[in-house]
């Protein structure tokens, strides 16, 4: 893993969340490597609609699983979500707030930058 991973804007990747502690490496960032098959690369500010949709679709982000270092999420938490789940949610019409500066460049393999920008909350 590189120490200077990039975001979807081509800049240094910013921290997503330390509380709850997120990331494939549980380092607070949406860093990734070849072992991250799910591409946990999109920094999302989750909301109840997104969490409920994910749970109903088979990806329960609400229930804590301490054995995996997963605290369970609530409305307003920031979390590194799998790019494929974000793509599915957006296709289903489920909106979520996305931080582009905190979202890893590899996300663009699954979700176009134009789509991400529609839901971005950190563009000025």
Q: What feature does the model see in each segment?
A:
Residues 62-69:
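Short alpha-helix capping/helix-loop boundary micro-motifs
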Residues 86-109:
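Short, compositionally biased
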Residues 45-60:
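Short, basic/aromatic beta-hairpin or loop at an interaction surface
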Residues 104-124:
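Glycine- and charge-enriched low-complexity intrinsically disordered segments
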Residues 1-49, 113, 120-122:
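Extended boundary segments
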